[in-house]
Structure formats: structure tokens, C-alpha cells
Amino acid sequence: MLRVCALYPDLMNIYADRGNLLLLRRRCEWRGIGFELAASDLGEPLGRAGEESDLFYIGGGQDRDQRLCAFDLAEVKRDGLHAAAARGAAVLAVCGGYQLLGHSYELGEETLPGAGLVDLNTVRADGPRLIGNVAIEVELPGLERRRVLAGFENHGGRTRLGPDAQPLGRVLRGHGNDGSSGFEGVRAGNVIGTYLHGPLLPKNVWLADWLIARALGREEPLAPLDDGLEAAAHVEARRAAGV
């Protein structure tokens, strides 16, 4: 049984990120793995879901909604999320959700608090937004070889990783965290943050399977599926990025 907790699913869903949750459900069901989805909204401590969920998911949102979620995440859900990550639960945070994983998000005159789950800070830059198709090379524990993640990025924030943070991958095409470092995303144990959306997992089902296996604590590979259509979607996403 895979137990998933979606954080702010109605507010943080600007880029059809709900597709990531649907993909996780289907890939579990097709393998005969049970799937439960819980939601935690504004003002709701993680409580039992924080203690029992195997995977937490947070997507991207509009500026106003992201601001509301930032304060709630820091003041209401922070301790529960830290405890879950410490026991090995997986976390996938996309775009705005990724920005909220760090210490803070500076917006000029205002600074939004973060969950402090990973060592990073984000600053909204005066320059143009970083927009376009993107591909990164990723190396994750348990995978026999390096893999490519492909998607779309659209962010005004520049994310800088601290000394205790490890990037998710190396940029092959696109801008990445800040347009200059050559890195994209962050990974700490089973916690992953990334700017890639579109949504991310339907274009990169290998990452969905990695998250499922890690969340369930499985060492052996998941049973293979007929991924012809999924492979075609991945090839098209890479083609769009020029990789």
C-alpha cells in the first residue's frame, strides 16, 4: 500500500500538477499495489497523515496562494514534514513547492518562510523569467545508470543551493535553478525538489517508479509495465528540449 499526502492540492496546482498524483495512482494500481491519497490544506497539521504517509507531494501555485501556503507550511506543517522525511518518507516538490522546501524565498520587500527541509534559498530576480523546455541528467541511488529528466520550466526565482544541499541533476538544456550554475533541483535522501513540470511524472515514468520504490522501502525493482506510450512521451519531451 502506497499512502500519499498531497499538500494544498487545490492551491498548488497551477501547472496541471495533479497529473503527477494520477500517474502515481495508476502505476500502483497496474501493479496491484494499493493506493491511498490524503490531502492537507491550510490550517491543518499533518497529524496522522504525517505519521503514516509514505510520500508527500506539493506542486506550484500563483503568488498569492504560494504566500498563504508558505506561512502555513512553516508554522503548521513544518515539524510533521521534518519527522516524515527523517523516517524515510519520500517528498516530491515541484516549482513553487520546490521553492518552499528551503529556508526562505525573498521577494524584494517581503521574505516568505520555507520548510527548511533542504539547504537552499530562493530570490526573485529583477531579470526575465526562466522559461522553456529543459532536460537534466540525473544519477539516483538504486539506478544502474544515469537517466534524463525532461519537462518545462517557468520561474522568476533563482534558487541557490547551500553547502549541505545536493543538486538533483546537471542541466543539459534549459536554465535550471538559477540560469548560471548548471544545476537543477535538489535531492536529500528521498526528498526531491525540481522546477520541471508539464506535468513531470507522466513524461518521466522512471522517476515515478523510483519514488514509489523508495517510498515503500523496496530494494528490488518494481514489476515492469508496458510503457510504450510513456516512452514516446519521454522521447517527445526530450526532443522539445533538444536532447
Each language-model region and where it sits:
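Structural motif
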Residues: 55-59, 92, 193-195
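Cysteine-nucleophile active-site neighborhood
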Residues: 63-140
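A glycine-centered loop/beta-turn motif at secondary-structure junctions
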Residues: 178-216
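Pocket-forming structural segment of enzyme catalytic cores
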Residues: 110-184
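N-terminal beta1-alpha1 cap of cysteine-dependent amidohydrolase-like domains
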Residues: 1-86, 202-243
